[in-house]
């Protein structure tokens, strides 16, 4: 990752309003270099261009940083560590669990957490619907889950009673929102502006309804 890439990243962070110190920026760049290296052999992401990785992976991940709640965060289907690793770098005071059922991907996630020196990351190789942690989560994130109704059905047992689910989507998922069960309320469904990305990006924030909520 050259100085041009570093400039693109720093400019993007400024536009997103995400404040990181120089050491955090260096860890983000080290993550991208590691991802490029592993991607040559393990096909972790279809994006090969380093400049595209900055925008479509790192900046896209950090576009939801301000929506995180609490200290205990779960990244469902983390894959190559997106959005979990960039968010863990930005939020060192939070505890992140990166969950993926693909052993090849969890090997990369574990290696990345060690090489990047990220003690706030734990990696779990498990399917979300059978994952049973000892403690529930304040925020559960999914970046590439097929449908909202499936995300809710498979992850709701992991959410604290007043926690939230964050679903990162492309186009506005109107049909998916209408199909959601009454047990969850839609807190927010908004567009995201990600530097260097022209495609539509949206975020849906959901919360479990309490008894008596209407």
Curated annotation (Swiss-Prot):
Pfam families for this protein: GidB
Gene Ontology terms: cellular component: cytosol
Protein name: Ribosomal RNA small subunit methyltransferase G
Compartment(s) of residence: Cytoplasm
Domain of life of the source: Bacteria
Keywords assigned by UniProt, alphabetized: Cytoplasm, Methyltransferase, rRNA processing, S-adenosyl-L-methionine, Transferase
Record-listed E.C. numbers: 2.1.1.170
SUPFAM superfamilies according to UniProt: S-adenosyl-L-methionine-dependent methyltransferases (SSF53335)
InterPro entries referenced in this protein's UniProt entry, alphabetically: rRNA_ssu_MeTfrase_G (IPR003682), SAM-dependent_MTases_sf (IPR029063)
Gene Ontology molecular function: any one: rRNA (guanine-N7-)-methyltransferase activity
Keyword field contains Repeat: no
Xref: Gene3D superfamilies: Vaccinia Virus protein VP39
Organism encoding this protein: Nitrosococcus oceani (strain ATCC 19707 / BCRC 17464 / JCM 30415 / NCIMB 11848 / C-107)
Entry similarity comment: Belongs to the methyltransferase superfamily. RNA methyltransferase RsmG family.
Flavoprotein keyword on record: no
């Amino acid at each position: 990752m050259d100085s041009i890439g570093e400039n693109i990243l720093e400019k993007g962070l400024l536009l997103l309003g995400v404040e990181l110190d120089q050491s955090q920026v260096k860890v983000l760049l080290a993550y991208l270099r590691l991802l490029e290296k592993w991607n040559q052999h393990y096909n972790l992401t279809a994006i090969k261009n380093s400049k595209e990785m900055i925008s479509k992976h790192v900046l896209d991940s950090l576009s939801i940083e301000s929506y995180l709640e609490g200290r205990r965060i779960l990244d469902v289907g983390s894959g190559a560590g997106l959005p979990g690793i960039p968010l863990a770098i930005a939020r060192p005071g939070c505890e992140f669990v990166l969950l993926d059922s693909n052993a090849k991907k969890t090997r990369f996630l574990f290696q990345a957490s060690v090489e990047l020196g990220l003690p706030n990351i734990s990696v779990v190789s498990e399917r979300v619907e059978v994952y049973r942690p000892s403690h529930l989560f304040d925020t559960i994130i999914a970046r590439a889950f097929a449908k909202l109704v499936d995300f809710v059905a498979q992850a709701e047992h992991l959410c604290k009673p007043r926690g939230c689910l964050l679903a990162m989507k492309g186009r506005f998922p109107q049909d998916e929102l209408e199909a959601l069960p009454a047990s969850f309320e839609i807190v927010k469904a908004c567009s995201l502006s990600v530097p260097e990305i022209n495609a539509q990006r949206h975020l849906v924030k959901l919360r479990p309804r309490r008894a008596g909520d209407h």
